[in-house]
Amino acid sequence: VSVALSFSAVQEKFNELQRDYSVLQSWRLTRDHAKRRAGVCYPLKKRIAISHYHIQLNSLSVIIDTLVHEVAHALAFELHNETGHGPHWRRWVTQLGGEAKVTGNFSVPETHWVLVHKQSDSLVQLARRHRKNKRIKDFILKGRPDTRGQLFYVSSAQFLAWQSGELLLSEVELIQ
């Protein structure tokens, strides 16, 4: 199923919810390019956004569940002036047929970079990142000023190759 078809189905569900709940008439549904979250509700802008990557990587039922989660935020805001995952949101998400959970179980895009701490002849993975921070050479581990200059980015592919023994540490490109 293409991203366009999936978004069309999500838009249809949103239109249905707008017909059922008149307070949603002035709201818009859009796509964005978030990589670390599935959807977001902007109450003051009256806009709900679903991630293009979420649509690309997940089933329609998972995407619709995300829409329901965000519409529950919109209804809780419009009818109760509540933001966040409070009691009104929980009631709305349940009433709409969703699960009252703050985070869902869904696929996210692979990251391009791994943030590592170089320790003598080893690399310790600290985090995965979609983008590199240009000031990495100034970073330290919390409470560890001795780690200045020891934090690097490594491409995800090279890190996996090093982990599996396909690359020696001396062959890994460490980027600061």
Annotated model-derived regions:
Residues 2-61, 78-176:
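Metalloprotease/metallohydrolase-associated module, dominated by Zn2+-dependent proteases
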